[in-house]
């Protein structure tokens, strides 16, 4: 990090530098655009260009001062066609009052007043000059200043202030937008002093994969359902055990019930025997029926 030319009050803290390094904001691409050379620290042996994070911090402060100078925050338009920056611009707009365009930029938003989405912003901020080229081109037609997060290979045509950083990683994009929002709130006076900690964590600005979140929710629900089934089975077995226990001694024991039935068995069998003796008469009747049948020759 090169020596900073900022007043001491604007110097970054150790935590700010560690966050920029942890989010890999200093790692650029292997290609280098000529206008991004002043922000280059060095080139690694594997060809990756390393960005000077001191320049990144200075440009974040400069961009924050430009944003804070706009009287109406709604006149600032933050744009991100790159998926990794869409959540960040929405959170930035929610915290600073700017207007967010997350996703595809409709051609004619700044030039065709007939469209429903027509806007006349005083300032636009884009996540990537390459993916948001349509917005930058239309801004150049109507003289709108442009702030952009630029990598080492990003085109800087019609970009007024370039913030050198890694604009391809989800963590680096989210962290730069978070730092930009924090500095804007500090300049506006929402945060009392620079030592005041912001209660919003950078993770809120990071991109989250909807499919991964959905799969995680499904897995959690399946775990809860399995736990409920196991608990219900244990409760049912517990109730069954209580019923078997509370029905008295010998309840649920087959041997006891059989012994009780066999105790009254002889009387019942004797009564049934009398009935069987009485039912022997039909058998005799059956024999007389056989005797009355005609011979085979008489059919």
Curated annotation (Swiss-Prot):
GO MF entry, a single one: structural constituent of ribosome
Biased composition (Low complexity): 259-291
Record key words, sorted: Cytoplasm, Ribonucleoprotein, Ribosomal protein
GO biological process, one term: translation
Places the protein is found: Cytoplasm
InterPro entries given in the database record: Ribosomal_uS2, Ribosomal_uS2_C, Ribosomal_uS2_CS, Ribosomal_uS2_euk, Ribosomal_uS2_euk/arc, Ribosomal_uS2_flav_dom_sf
Chain intervals for the UniProt region annotation (Disordered): 259-299
GO cellular component, one term: cytosolic small ribosomal subunit
Family from the record: Belongs to the universal ribosomal protein uS2 family.
Oligomeric form and interacting partners: Component of the small ribosomal subunit. Mature ribosomes consist of a small (40S) and a large (60S) subunit. The 40S subunit contains about 33 different proteins and 1 molecule of RNA (18S). The 60S subunit contains about 49 different proteins and 3 molecules of RNA (25S, 5.8S and 5S). Interacts with rps21.
Function, in words: Required for the assembly and/or stability of the 40S ribosomal subunit. Required for the processing of the 20S rRNA-precursor to mature 18S rRNA in a late step of the maturation of 40S ribosomal subunits.
PANTHER family named in the record: 40S RIBOSOMAL PROTEIN SA
NCBIfam families linked to this entry: uS2_euk_arch
Name by which UniProt lists this protein: Small ribosomal subunit protein uS2
Name of the coding gene: rps0
């Amino acid at each position: 990090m090169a020596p900073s030319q900022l007043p001491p009050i604007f110097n970054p803290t150790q935590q700010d530098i560690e966050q920029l390094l942890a989010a890999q904001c200093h790692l650029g691409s292997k290609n280098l655009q000529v206008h991004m050379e002043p922000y280059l620290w060095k080139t690694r042996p594997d060809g990756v260009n390393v960005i000077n994070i001191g320049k990144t911090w200075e440009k974040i402060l400069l961009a924050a001062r430009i944003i804070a100078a706009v009287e109406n925050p709604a006149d600032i338009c933050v744009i991100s066609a790159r998926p990794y920056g869409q959540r960040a611009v929405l959170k930035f707009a929610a915290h600073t009052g700017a207007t967010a365009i997350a996703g595809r930029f409709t051609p004619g938003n700044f030039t065709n007043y007939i469209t429903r989405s027509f806007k006349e912003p005083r300032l636009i901020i884009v996540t990537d000059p390459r993916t948001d080229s349509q917005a930058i081109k239309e801004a150049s037609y109507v003289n709108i200043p442009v702030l952009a997060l630029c990598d080492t290979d990003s085109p800087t045509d019609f970009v007024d202030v370039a913030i050198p950083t890694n604009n391809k990683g989800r963590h680096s994009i989210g962290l730069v937008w978070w730092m930009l929002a924090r500095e804007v709130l500090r300049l506006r006076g929402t945060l009392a002093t620079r030592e005041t900690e912001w209660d919003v964590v950078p993770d809120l600005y990071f991109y989250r994969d909807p499919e991964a979140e959905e799969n995680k929710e499904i897995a959690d629900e399946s775990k809860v359902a399995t736990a409920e089934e196991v608990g219900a089975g244990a409760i049912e077995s517990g109730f069954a055990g209580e019923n078997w226990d509370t029905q008295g001694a010998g309840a649920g024991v087959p041997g006891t019930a059989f012994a009780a039935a066999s105790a009254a068995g002889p009387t019942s069998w004797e009564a049934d025997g009398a009935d069987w003796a009485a039912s022997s008469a039909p058998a005799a009747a059956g024999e007389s029926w056989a005797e009355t049948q005609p011979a085979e020759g008489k059919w």
